[in-house]
Amino acid sequence: MTTDAELRELTVGTGAGGEQLGTDMVLNIGPQHPSTHGVLRLRLVLDGERVVSAEPIVGYMHRGAEKLFEVRDYRQIIVLANRHDWLSAFANELGVVLAVERLMGMEVPERATWLRMALAELNRVLNHLMFLGSYPLEIGAITPMFYAFRERETLQAVLEEVSGGRIHYMFNRVGGLKEEVPAGWTGRARTAIGEVRRRMPDLDRLIRRNEIFLARTVGVGVLSAAQAAAFGASGPVARASGLDLDLRRDEPYLAYDQLEVPVVTRTAGDCHSRFEVLLDQVYVSLDLAEQCLDQVDRLTGPVNTRLPKVLKAPEGHTYAWTENPLGINGYYLVSRGEKTPWRLKLRTASYANVQALATLLPGCLVPDLIAILGSMFFVVGDIDK
């Protein structure tokens, strides 16, 4: 015989008792999705169209780069160093050679230092243009992609001429650069920078104040400065939340201490702020690259250091970090005096930045998910290594 109490327990099961009955939906995004460079999986718990919890699941592109470093000599590791973040290839190989040079106490020719800075800033612009074109595409704006890739091709031709590679440059060497740049290259690079600077307002006007773009991004995916700091976020993601941090200014390497590096920041911490920081950083990097080219033209001398046939680093350890296009990358190198690293640990910007998704996504709507995910500007290979 059913009592009144049992009847009451049954009727509670609709509506208010939904949580106890497990009516929330678990949704897997990925492990393949068009808004990522690579393969990422998100495990979401949804209440209707609102995200209750989010868990980024990484590792699908893990290729064991850090273990492979241990069986490659100090010349060969450069080949691997630029592959985990293929949009920041020059910056990645630069960080590795800086760590090796620091451990060996090596002085790099001044001309090579300024050439490295010029190429690093051009690589930064190429990275940013990729996201400036692909991010609007993810939320329905097709045209900006064509503008962004027009500018990318202009600068890509310059880097391809100097290194021979379009994506994986492999132009850095321990002690400097692979070889001297072609005759007249600095002039052609300066011309390309001028063309991109002149045409960038076309992309700027097309998207920055577009009403539909503003509706999809303003106030969406807000990451506070405290949250960004807690997750170790850096680069455009952190600066859009108000963290005024840039290693080129705060912990200068190469010859950045001889330049005035403007740091672009915002305080809103939303998707639109992250996009604006990326856009404005393009102008800054174009200016810095041009200043570096001016210095290169004033300097003479070699661009590399003569090295022994077998290159061995002394026993010890060191840490080098760089301001990569997507944020701070760190390189912890341990040597036992052999021709291969005993350990080379990578601290990548994308890995730190993507952790914030677990805090950023809960509370948002499913239609806003792609807008938030795309605005975090990460490369999955940089996460998984």
Swiss-Prot record:
Molecular function via GO: NAD binding; NADH:ubiquinone reductase (non-electrogenic) activity; quinone binding
GO CC annotations, alphabetized: plasma membrane
InterPro entries: NADH_Q_OxRdtase_suD (IPR001135), NADH_UbQ_OxRdtase_49kDa_CS (IPR014029), NDH1_su_D/H (IPR022885), NiFe-Hase_large (IPR029014)
Pfam families hit by this protein: Complex1_49kDa
Catalytic activity of the protein: a quinone + NADH + 5 H(+)(in) = a quinol + NAD(+) + 4 H(+)(out)
Presence of the UniProt keyword Coiled coil in the record: no
Membrane topology summary: Peripheral membrane protein
Family from the record: Belongs to the complex I 49 kDa subunit family.
Assembly and binders: NDH-1 is composed of 14 different subunits. Subunits NuoB, C, D, E, F, and G constitute the peripheral sector of the complex.
Listed name of the protein: NADH-quinone oxidoreductase subunit D 2
Name of the gene: nuoD2
